Each structure stands twice: as structure tokens, then as C-alpha cells.
Amino acid sequence: VLLKMKEIADAYLGKKVTDVVITVPAYFNDSQRQATKDAGVIAGLNVLRIINEPNAAAIAYGLDKKVEKEKNVLIFDLGGGTFDVSILAIEDGIFEVKSTAGDTHLGGEDF
């Protein structure tokens, strides 16, 4: 999957993609995260970081730029087949993960 995504990104950008950040479900354990990172290396990618999908959603939404003083934020990531939440402390553009959890048996398809 990562190799195919790399090929799509290379074609879309018109240049080789090497450095990547990969998102994973919040419930992934350390061995699943390492396997994802290893798959990235096999696909010829330099995996800079593995981050939880709820954290990626917070960054994409721009919370790092909208928060002026330290705030605790609860992020819901209601995917098609999973439900992830993270509690983040955000200050000066820095995200500190306080807690994260997920449920593989509850997601958007269940609603």
C-alpha cells in the first residue's frame, strides 16, 4: 500500500517523494507502528514520524495555529470502521499527547 501511495505521490508532484509522515489508528501498538515504519523503508521512504490519526486531524484543522495559550483538546476521529480519541495539550504549536484510545469495533459505518 505504501509503495502504491509513493508512486501516486511521485506522479502527482512530478518528483520523487522520500521523506514522509505516516498516520496510523490510535489503537496501534508499538509493534504495529514499527511494522508500518518498516513497510515504509521497504517502499523506499524515509519515515520521519508515525502519528495517530486524531493528532493528524488536529494538525490538519490548524489547531496548532488557532490556540493562543495552553489548551487541552479532545479530538474525535470517527472513521469508517474505527473510533479514535486523543486528549492533547497544545501550546506554542507543540502538541503533547496526554491520552489516546481507539475502538476497532465502533465507527462511522455503525451509525
Curated annotation (Swiss-Prot):
A Pfam family assignment: HSP70
GO molecular function: ATP binding; ATP-dependent protein folding chaperone
Xref: InterPro entries: ATPase_NBD, Heat_shock_70_CS, Hsp_70_fam
Record-linked SUPFAM superfamilies: Actin-like ATPase domain
Secreted among keywords: no
This protein's UniProt keywords: ATP-binding, Nucleotide-binding, Stress response
Disulfide bonds: none
Domain of life assignment: Eukaryota
TM region(s), chain numbering: none
Family to which the UniProt record says this protein belongs: Belongs to the heat shock protein 70 family.
Protein name per the record: Heat shock 70 kDa protein
Native source species: Hydra oligactis
